[in-house]
Amino acid sequence: MVMTDPIADFLTRIRNANQANHSVVEAPASNIKRGIAEILKCEGFVKDVEVIEDDKQGIIRIFLKYGQNGERVITGLKRISKPGLRVYTKREDVPKVLNGLGIAIISTSEGLLTDREARQKNIGGEVITYVW
């Protein structure tokens, strides 16, 4: 069976592992998934990211982060732009997630950026996902 939206599958794997309090989640690797995982690491939503190279596609391993009492750091993940309905934003209309408490990951001409970085660089693009 052909997967129509590998990014949604990647986000769903993270969401399900997070809700089940797993410490590690693995998914097939791609450049955009690596970029999303690195942004999640830089923004403090996950502990670490490893890319395991094999002779095929590779595997991306994400170490999830929890608070001192076991509370989730990632409260929500939502796929915004989908293959059937792409969502783009102009540079003036870059969204804020929960008034800045969350992040929007945007695919721009300069690569994957958070909403904050896109606002600073004054560029728009395709809104991939919201994380809070």
UniProtKB/Swiss-Prot annotation:
A Pfam family (short name) is Ribosomal_S8
GO molecular function list: rRNA binding; structural constituent of ribosome
GO (cellular component) term, any one: ribosome
Q: Which Gene3D superfamilies match?
A: 3.30.1370.30, 3.30.1490.10
What's a single GO BP term from this record? translation
UniProtKB keywords: Ribonucleoprotein, Ribosomal protein, RNA-binding, rRNA-binding
HAMAP family, alphabetically?
Ribosomal_uS8_B (MF_01302_B)
Please give the function described in this protein's UniProt entry.
One of the primary rRNA binding proteins, it binds directly to 16S rRNA central domain where it helps coordinate assembly of the platform of the 30S subunit.
Q: Which family does it belong to?
A: Belongs to the universal ribosomal protein uS8 family.
What binding partners and quaternary form does the record give?
Part of the 30S ribosomal subunit. Contacts proteins S5 and S12.
This protein is called Small ribosomal subunit protein uS8
Task: State the species of origin.
Answer: Streptococcus mutans serotype c (strain ATCC 700610 / UA159)
Mind giving the lineage of the organism this protein is from? Answer: Bacteria, Bacillati, Bacillota, Bacilli, Lactobacillales
- Gene behind the chain: rpsH
